[in-house]
């Protein structure tokens, strides 16, 4: 019995899409390597909380040109981090203050109303306000400069286009996997193709090494991929 031509056509599309996805991802990685020496570290005065890659503010974390979290050497951040934290965390990813955050901080500093029971206390609070305003203005300048430079480099490198290429390739893989799942299989080779498409979709990646029904299904799919060629040869 011959295999379903629709299934074979969809499988050919999957192989083309997977090749394009791999090449697109390689091209994106190449950009990261090519621009690593040009990509600036955020000024230390803009750094916020540590472990930004693990918390709820990962969207504000310091990243490289393609959006991967950047880990800094904490041993040099003696004024910012306690010795114990530096010992336990040799590297860490930090939140970076955006121009919007810096502008908001500046507005808070400007609207702060100094209060004090004595003239001396009031004078101290006024001086504190002026210092906060000056620091916030400096942070705003730094944040705008950092945003401008990183944006310039992303545009020069064509990062958005490279990411769009990866996204388009992922969509093509998903479309091919869907077409394969909807086509009937007539032979053991067809079963292998369908199982391979399920694996290629990435749906089971999160369940590797875990228990439960999804892990069992993932194991079954891999078994089909392994056994189907033997069945085809035996036939």
Residues of each region from the PLM?
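C-terminal or late-domain output modules
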Residues: 1, 162-235
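Contiguous, amphipathic alpha-helical segments that mediate oligomerization or scaffolding
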Residues: 2-57, 133, 137-186
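Charged, low-complexity eukaryotic segments
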Residues: 4-15, 90-100, 106-149, 153
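Surface-exposed polar/charged interaction patches
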Residues: 20, 34, 38-41, 72, ...
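Extended alpha-helical coiled-coil "stalk/arm" regions
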Residues: 27-127
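Long, amphipathic, charge-rich alpha-helical segments that form helical bundles/coiled-coils
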Residues: 65-96, 129-136, 140, 145, ...
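Extended aliphatic helical segments
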Residues: 76, 95-96, 113, 141, ...
């Amino acid at each position: 019995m011959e295999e379903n031509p629709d299934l074979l056509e969809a499988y050919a599309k999957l192989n083309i899409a997977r090749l394009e996805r791999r090449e697109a991802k390689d091209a994106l990685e190449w950009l990261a390597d090519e621009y690593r020496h040009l990509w600036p570290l955020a000024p230390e005065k803009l750094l916020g909380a540590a472990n930004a890659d693990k918390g709820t503010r990962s969207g504000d974390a310091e990243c490289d040109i393609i959006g991967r979290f950047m880990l800094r050497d904490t041993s040099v951040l003696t004024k910012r981090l306690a010795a114990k934290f530096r010992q336990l965390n040799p590297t860490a990813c930090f939140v970076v203050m955006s121009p919007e955050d810096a502008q908001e901080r500046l507005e808070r500093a400007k609207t702060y109303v100094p209060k004090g029971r004595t003239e001396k206390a009031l004078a101290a609070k006024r001086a504190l306000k002026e210092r906060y305003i000056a620091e916030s203005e400096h942070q705003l300048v730094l944040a705008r400069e950092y945003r401008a430079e990183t944006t310039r480099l992303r545009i020069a490198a064509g990062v958005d286009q490279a990411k769009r290429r990866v996204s388009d390739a992922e969509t093509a893989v998903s479309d091919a996997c869907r077409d394969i799942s909807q086509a009937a299989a007539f032979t053991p080779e067809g079963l292998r193709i369908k199982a391979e498409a399920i694996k290629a979709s990435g749906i089971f990646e999160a369940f590797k090494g875990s228990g439960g029904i999804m892990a069992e299904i993932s194991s079954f799919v891999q078994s089909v991929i392994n056994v189907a060629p033997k069945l085809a040869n035996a036939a």
